[in-house]
């Protein structure tokens, strides 16, 4: 009897499917602990926070008032008032640089150029005796080598990017509504093309209609500029509008 033979067909060689890679970490916070010391008590504002945000990502910090959202943002730039506040432990890395060990001169270089902050009340960020355009131009001059004319032109570009006519460059903060003031602050925050924007409940002081307009503007800028953003908010709805990955603080 003829022996049965099995013929095996060789399968074509295929290259392995590459595994998805996590985005390169832009901001990496590990075990952050921040306390506020008073004569009567110690407030544990942030207790062991871990978070990572990659380039071009958005992350929402969600929590009630007093949950530590603002403290977290201030800690990144070492802006915690000491006393009474103090970073008690943990690590904060930005683009591979240890922010807790950075010298004051280096921190001044980073603030406003690589990392910007948008605070709740725009009036705390705007000087009432200078025009809005000059205040944006000042941020540009602090971090970029350019002429006065070039700084003015770029500041005008920033105003137009956030929906304010260039013709309003020489107007003062009191001539703007609350929502328009916040647009000016946003223009200041993006003037030097930062890698990261820390938005600390920037719509809290605005009415509901203006909140929606500012949120829509931030979403458009996020997509256009590909800037990483952390958005501190309560309630959670704001982070959902901005397509953020929420983190409970």
Language-model-derived ranges and their functions:
Residues 171-176, 180:
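Conserved ABC ATPase signature
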Residues 87, 99-116, 134, 142:
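ABC ATPase NBD coupling module
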């Amino acid at each position: 009897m003829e022996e049965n033979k099995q013929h095996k067909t060789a399968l074509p060689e295929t290259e392995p499917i590459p595994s998805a890679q996590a985005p390169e970490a832009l901001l990496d916070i590990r075990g952050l602990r921040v306390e506020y010391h008073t004569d009567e008590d110690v407030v544990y504002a942030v207790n062991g926070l871990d978070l990572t945000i990659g380039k071009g990502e958005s992350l929402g910090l969600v929590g009630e008032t007093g949950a530590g959202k603002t403290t977290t943002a201030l800690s990144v730039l070492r802006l915690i008032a000491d006393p009474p506040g103090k970073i008690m432990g943990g690590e904060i890395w930005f683009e591979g640089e240890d922010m807790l060990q950075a010298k004051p001169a280096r921190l001044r270089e980073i603030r406003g150029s690589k990392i910007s902050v948008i605070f709740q009340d725009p009036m705390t960020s705007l000087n009432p005796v200078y025009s809005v355009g000059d205040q944006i131009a000042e941020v540009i001059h602090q971090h970029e080598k350019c002429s006065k004319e070039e700084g003015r032109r770029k500041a005008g570009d920033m105003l137009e990017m956030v929906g304010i006519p260039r013709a309003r460059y020489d107007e003062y903060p009191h001539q703007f509504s609350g929502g328009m003031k916040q647009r000016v602050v946003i223009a200041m925050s993006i003037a030097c093309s930062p890698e990261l924007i820390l938005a600390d409940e920037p719509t809290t002081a605005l009415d509901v209609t203006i909140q929606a307009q500012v949120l829509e503007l931030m979403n458009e800028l996020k997509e256009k500029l590909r800037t990483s953003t952390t958005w501190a908010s309560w309630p959670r709805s704001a982070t959902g509008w901005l397509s953020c990955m929420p983190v409970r603080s």
